[in-house]
């Protein structure tokens, strides 16, 4: 294939498909992390292309916290049914027994127990040696320096000072017993690339990405959508209707919406062309402390 004859989106697509096929061929028990967002939707689409007309040779894994938006759960179940994928859902039983929730315990503890520990439990339970993730280098500074093949020790920890060179699309997947890797096929994509590809390929996405009037409360400079009756209103807070959408999706009490008029994919793309802020400005977990994402990844976060 002559890469010079491809558009930049087709080059990114080809690179991602190559990575997905490499991992499927090289590792004994891979899995694709499925968090239901736009990046997961693109990654799943690429994986289906990589093995078409066959089925995916690995399952999807959703590490569930119990606090995703209702529309995300509906979209997940619809997608799995439509494509005939094998879906594994894991929720940290210890966290459930402790009653961990983001309102009472805060974003850091909730993320550590329900996401990081939940992910490590699932990887250990099924013995996965490679896990695909939809992270991109343009999202956050610690992800910017992470390799496509991100090696983890037997405790699932990442050491940014111990990464392997990746030259000319050659990847060294040699691991010792108990070790594993996280694989990021979308590393070189940008947020704009993702939206342009979704539009080009007509990929279905969670409706929360499109602007519409929604019930929100303003808290700590963020617009939190009231998704169910578990909302813990603080003194003086009032639920109001605002036309908002989400640039990134996570647990609804920890994910801020943005005011927007973008009701269609072309409108989102136009909005991205003039945006000067990071999509992760709406993630409360990134505000826990300086370097919080790198710390979480060192502890086993994806």
Curated annotation (Swiss-Prot):
Domain of life, per lineage: Bacteria
GO biological process, one term: sulfate assimilation
GN (gene name): cysD
NCBIfam families: CysD (TIGR02039), PRK05253.1 (NF003587), PRK12563.1 (NF009214)
Reactions mediated catalytically: sulfate + ATP + H(+) = adenosine 5'-phosphosulfate + diphosphate
Entry keyword annotation includes Nucleotide-binding: yes
Gene3D superfamilies registered for this protein in UniProt: HUPs
Short name of one Pfam family: PAPS_reduct
Pathway note: Sulfur metabolism; hydrogen sulfide biosynthesis; sulfite from sulfate: step 1/3
UniProt EC number: 2.7.7.4
UniProt similarity note: Belongs to the PAPS reductase family. CysD subfamily.
Protein name: Sulfate adenylyltransferase subunit 2
Name of the top EC class for this enzyme: transferase
């Amino acid at each position: 294939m002559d890469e010079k004859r491809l558009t930049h989106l087709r080059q990114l697509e080809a690179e991602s498909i190559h990575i997905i096929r490499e991992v499927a061929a090289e590792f004994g028990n891979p899995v694709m992390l499925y968090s239901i967002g736009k990046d997961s939707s693109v990654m799943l689409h690429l994986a289906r292309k990589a093995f078409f007309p066959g089925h995916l040779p690995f399952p999807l894994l959703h590490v569930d916290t119990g606090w995703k938006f209702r529309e995300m759960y509906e979209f997940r179940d619809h997608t799995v049914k439509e494509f005939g994928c094998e879906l594994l859902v894991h929720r940290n039983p210890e966290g459930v027994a402790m009653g961990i929730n983001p309102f009472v315990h805060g974003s850091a503890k909730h993320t550590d127990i329900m996401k990081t520990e939940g992910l490590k439990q699932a990887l250990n339970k099924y013995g996965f040696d490679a896990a695909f993730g939809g992270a991109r280098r343009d999202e956050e500074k610690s992800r910017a320096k992470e390799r496509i093949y991100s090696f983890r020790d037997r405790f699932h920890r990442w050491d940014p000072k111990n990464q392997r060179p990746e030259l000319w699309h050659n990847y060294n997947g040699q691991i010792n017993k108990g070790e594993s890797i996280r694989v990021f096929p979308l590393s070189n994509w940008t947020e704009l690339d993702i939206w342009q590809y979704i539009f080009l390929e007509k990929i279905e996405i969670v409706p929360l990405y499109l602007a519409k009037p929604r019930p929100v409360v303003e808290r700590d400079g963020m617009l939190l959508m009231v998704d169910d009756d578990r909302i813990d209103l603080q003194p003086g807070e009032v639920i109001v209707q605002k036309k908002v959408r989400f640039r990134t999706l996570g647990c609804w009490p920890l994910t801020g919406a943005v005011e927007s008029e973008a009701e269609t994919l072309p409108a989102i793309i136009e909005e991205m062309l003039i945006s000067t802020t990071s999509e992760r400005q709406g993630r409360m977990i990134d505000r826990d402390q300086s370097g919080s994402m790198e710390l979480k990844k060192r502890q086993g976060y994806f």
